[in-house]
């Protein structure tokens, strides 16, 4: 069977920081280009890292196979094969999903996805693992902050 691919971004703060830094590289390149009237080698060389980081940021994806969910991150060596049997539960809201698994350091991880992609991803996941618990949660990711605050006090 064909692999299914779904694109994602990390939680909101990390996404904003990543794309802000990426577009800073673009703006530096454009500023350098405006300093000269003709093509400017340094400006073009600075634009190359922008395209590399833009591609890496867009290429984050889930690849779903018969037995695992492959989480592809920005860095190629951080690609993680998450066995479907290790996924305990999935919660979602209109813009993000949270996957609970013992494979993650913190026990769960939040992924931002497009509104149209979330139902397709959940449906594909339910086909591969019918007994999976899927629940809607509008306070996605906030329970970690509450637990941390309780443990500090």
Swiss-Prot record:
It is found in: Cell membrane. The keyword Cell membrane applies. The chain crosses the membrane at residues 12-32, 39-59. Its main location: membrane. The keyword Transmembrane helix applies. It is a multi-pass membrane protein. It comes from the Bacteria. Keywords: Cell membrane, Membrane, Transmembrane, Transmembrane helix. One of its GO terms (cellular component) is plasma membrane. It holds the Pfam family EbsA. Seems to play some role in the cell surface expression of a chromosomally encoded receptor, named enterococcal binding substance (EBS), that mediates mating aggregate formation. Might interfere with the synthesis or assembly of EBS, and/or assist in the localization of EbsB to the cell wall. Belongs to the EbsA family. This is Protein EbsA. It comes from Enterococcus faecalis (strain ATCC 700802 / V583).
